[in-house]
C-alpha cells in the first residue's frame, strides 16, 4: 500500500509525527511537509521537522512542497490513501476550491478526482462559516474530515495515549488495522 502524508503549517505537528511513527512498516509512505510546517514545528515544539521525519521513517520518501512534478502528483502513480495532518485552513481552502499549486494540494486533488481515500485533520478553532463551508465541500467530495478531537472514555493518562487515540481513529478511517486505543465496550 502507498500512502501520502501531507503536513501543513497548522498547529499540531507532533500529531503528524505520531501518525508517521505508528504507521505500519509495510506501508510505503511519501511525506510532503510545507515550508510553514517546518517553521511551526520549530516555533511550537522546537522540532527540526526534516530530521524528525527521517528519524521516524528512514525508508520514507520525502518531497519538497514545490516539487509539483513528483510521482505522487499523478493519478497514474497509484497512491492508495492520503492524510493531511494537521490541515491548515489555508490548505483546506486550496483543496476545496481546486487550487493545486503545491504538492500537498495537488496530491489531495488527485485523490479526490481518483475517488481514493483522503483524510483531512483540520486544526483550527473556532471555525468561521467560510471554513465550515470549505470542509463541507470537501466532505461532499468524499474527503474524510477527521479533526483531532480529544476523548475521555479511554481514560487516557498521558499525552501519548491521547495522541494514539487520534492516530488510531485516523487509521480506522483509512482502513489501516491498529490496536492503538481501547475500543468502546471491549474491555
From Swiss-Prot:
SUPFAM superfamilies: Homo-oligomeric flavin-containing Cys decarboxylases, HFCD
Binding residue positions for FMN: 9-11, 34, 123
GO MF entries: carboxy-lyase activity; flavin prenyltransferase activity
Superkingdom of this protein's organism: Bacteria
Claim: Flavoprotein is one of the keywords in the record: yes
Function: Flavin prenyltransferase that catalyzes the synthesis of the prenylated FMN cofactor (prenyl-FMN) for 4-hydroxy-3-polyprenylbenzoic acid decarboxylase UbiD. The prenyltransferase is metal-independent and links a dimethylallyl moiety from dimethylallyl monophosphate (DMAP) to the flavin N5 and C6 atoms of FMN.
Name this protein carries in UniProt: Flavin prenyltransferase UbiX
Species in which this protein is naturally found: Helicobacter pylori (strain ATCC 700392 / 26695) (Campylobacter pylori)
Lineage: Bacteria, Pseudomonadati, Campylobacterota, Epsilonproteobacteria, Campylobacterales
Gene name tied to this protein: ubiX
